[in-house]
Curated annotation (Swiss-Prot):
Pfam families: F-box-like (PF12937), WD40 (PF00400). Present with 217 molecules/cell in log phase SD medium. Induction: Transcriptional activation requires MET4 as well as MET31 and MET32. Regulated by intracellular AdoMet levels. L-methionine regulates the abundance of MET30. The amount of MET30 regulates the activity of the E3 ubiquitin ligase complex SCF(Met30). Changing L530D: Inactivates MET30 and prevents MET4 interaction. Residues 1-19 have a biased composition (Basic and acidic residues). One of its GO terms (molecular function) is molecular sensor activity. Pathway: Protein modification; protein ubiquitination. The gene is MET30. The keyword Membrane does not apply. This is F-box protein MET30.
Length: 640
């Protein structure tokens, strides 16, 4: 036994000499001895604690592990075994897999325990071998461990070249697990956050389930701020999702906080984590896509509802019964009814200060809707006022008298734009470009310059009366679906325009006008008509680039935001369309038309449904009004 111990000790000294020679010959190259983990260094030991008794009664050699030591000189452990000094713990002397700072970190404890268990299994298997084979294995491992990178690669090449398929398969199964690197945890935080910012929402949520370190990084506010910036009020080009602004809900929360909470509560409401903001909007968008909503009805008008608009707390409706209803969206109750028009209220517009209504009685009224007082009345149209729009001190109106009027409130002047040959059903201002759009029963759409009161373009393509138009500025034009063959035509000259009789009448210039590129005109125009279609137009060229079919009867009204189009039809249905693709996402059927008899019983008129006369859209809701006087709210924010 003494002879055996001396032989082993001389063998260990020889390994140390080989290591010293290797270090001196490769001083410019970092040795892999320093790359070995202190806890996984394979040592040859002969102590009673590390040697096991075999069935033959002889001592067996084992692979032992030891704890880190900070002593710079050769030391002796409790069993008398000589050990080598350990390098400092840093990334310049350790690779990722053998770095103690990583091994002992909380996020890698489980991985370290698995490796330690694996080492113990190897020790146990070696201990079962004869003493000579144990010595040979330890010599091979020691030689490999003390070699530099170049020698290690040569040894591996030789081993792999002499290995058969069973051994190669075994190596492959081990390496697949061992080469995995948790780069997120070891990189600087800024780089880790940058990498995570490229993930989509689903992948980012999955990342929080990996470990605590990943959860902390994936939940960082900076990552979710980037997600919100990519998706809110725009469509992400990578995943195709866009999230609503929910500005009306935010205004509603601030309004409630101002009335019932302290400044600290308001501050709490306005400083929510970006992940919470994203989650809230993601749920709303998901409900829009799946068609999940809660329906609420507003009943109070005695006749059909012709127009409606809303803000974060109030709903305004105009009806054939010549009244304007103001509803509380929280309670669903009618809080005020404005009377003054002598005929049906066909159109309305409101802002924070005033309410403007147009009626079949040929007048336009301006109201203080808070007090219910009529501030002023505008008379000038010779037939029913069908549409009004306003911006600051300018009001535009369209009428059944075939004209568009521009009212300048401050200068108290009115200009009449002539060109349509039938009723003007809708007018829309675009303040940034000082332009106005109008559509008519003559199947045309006209674009006007309200500074010069001249007609810039005429859009032709509908084969039925055009009922509604919406100017749009679409940024993501590349992903906008268009028809390969458009039946629309370029703007054409119209010889039917005549001068007005009064001095303020302004004849339109029908000569085709090239739009000034320096003026921010809307990029597209959306329209609907009684030809059962919805059309999308390119404002610059004046051509129809897409036609959407789906309704079986005329489309009376449309509304749109950055993601969706809502349409209401005479067939009694409300359809939700994707703005970019033009595909119909959902169809909501209107209520069946019923009338009460004198005995308070309801009599159904067969399968007939109430035609939808008007619609409007918000971030998390849309509204419809039908010809039986019922208003419906489709609420997609189910948490409210």
């Amino acid at each position: 036994m003494r002879r055996e111990r001396q032989r082993m000790m001389s063998f260990e000294d020889k390994d140390k000499d080989d290591l010293d020679n290797s270090n001196s010959n490769n001083s410019s190259e970092m040795t892999d001895t320093a790359m070995m983990p202190p806890l996984k260094r394979l040592l040859i030991t002969g102590s009673s604690d590390d040697l096991a008794q075999g069935s033959s009664g002889k001592k067996k050699m084992t692979m032992a592990t030891r704890s880190p030591s900070s002593s710079p000189d050769l030391a002796t452990n409790d069993s008398g075994t000589r050990v080598q000094p350990l390098p400092e713990y840093n990334f310049t002397k350790f690779c990722y897999r053998h770095n103690p700072d990583i091994q002992f970190s909380p996020t890698h404890t489980a991985c370290y325990k698995q490796d330690l268990k694996r080492t113990q299994e190897i020790n146990a298997n070696i201990a079962k071998l004869p003493l000579q084979e144990q010595s040979d294995i330890h010599h091979i491992i020691s030689k490999y461990s003390n070699s530099n990178d170049k020698i290690r690669k040569l040894i591996l090449d030789g081993i792999l070249s002499t290995s058969c398929f069973p051994q190669l398969s075994y190596i492959s199964s081990l390496v697949t697990h061992m080469i995995k690197i948790d780069f997120i945890s070891i990189l600087p935080q800024e780089l880790s956050l940058k990498i995570l910012s490229y993930l989509d929402c689903q992948s980012l949520c999955n990342a929080t389930r990996v470990c605590r370190k990943w959860q902390k990084l994936a939940d960082d506010d900076r990552v979710w701020y980037h997600m919100c910036e990519q998706h809110i009020d725009r469509k992400c080009p990578n995943c195709g999702w866009g999230l609503p602004l929910l500005h009306m809900k935010r205004a509603r929360i601030q309004q409630n906080s101002t009335g019932s909470s302290s400044n600290a509560d308001i501050q709490t409401q306005t400083t929510r984590p970006w992940k919470v903001i994203y989650r809230e909007r993601f749920k709303v968008e998901s409900n829009w896509r799946k068609g999940h909503c809660r329906i609420q009805e507003f009943k109070g008008h005695m006749d059909g509802v012709l127009t409606l608009q809303f803000n974060y707390r109030l709903l305004f409706t105009g009806s054939y019964d010549s009244t304007i209803g103001i509803w509380d969206l929280f309670t669903g109750k009618l809080i005020r009814r404005l009377s003054g028009h002598s005929d049906g209220v066909k159109t309305l517009y409101f802002d924070d200060r005033k309410l403007i209504t147009g009626s079949l009685d040929k007048t336009i009224r301006v109201w203080n809707y808070i007090t219910g007082e009529c501030i002023s009345t505008y008379r000038g149209h010779s037939d029913s006022v069908l549409s009004v729009d306003s911006y600051q001190k300018v009001i535009v109106s369209g009428s059944a008298d075939k004209t568009v009027k521009v009212w300048h409130v401050e200068s108290r002047t009115c200009y009449t734009l002539r060109g349509h040959t039938e009723w003007v059903n809708c007018v829309k201002l675009h303040p940034k470009s000082f332009s106005c759009f109008s559509c008519s029963d003559d199947t045309t759409i006209r674009m006007w310059d309200i500074r010069t009161n001249s007609c810039l373009k005429v859009f032709r393509g509908h084969v039925g009366q055009v009922q509604k138009i919406i100017p749009l500025t679409i940024k993501d034009v590349e992903n906008l679906a268009t028809d390969n063959t458009s039946d629309g035509s370029s703007p054409q000259d119209d010889p039917t325009m005549t001068d007005g009789a009064d001095e303020s009448d302004t004849p339109s210039n029908e000569q085709e006008t090239v739009l000034d590129e320096n003026i921010p005109y809307p990029t597209h125009l959306l329209s609907c008509g009684l030809d059962n279609t919805i059309k999308l137009w390119d404002v610059k060229t004046g051509k129809c680039i897409r036609t959407q079919f789906g309704h079986v009867e005329g489309v009376w009204d449309i509304a749109a935001d950055n993601f969706r189009i809502i349409s209401g039809s005479h067939d009694g249905s409300i359809k939700v369309w994707d703005l970019q693709s033009g595909k119909c996402m959902h169809t909501f059927n209107g209520r069946r038309l019923q009338r009460e008899t004198q005995h308070t019983q309801t009599q159904s008129l067969g399968d007939k449904v109430a035609p939808i006369a008007c619609v409007c859209i918000g971030d998390s809701e849309c509204f419809s009004g039908d010809e039986f006087g019922c208003v419906k709210m489709y609420k997609f924010d189910l948490n409210d």
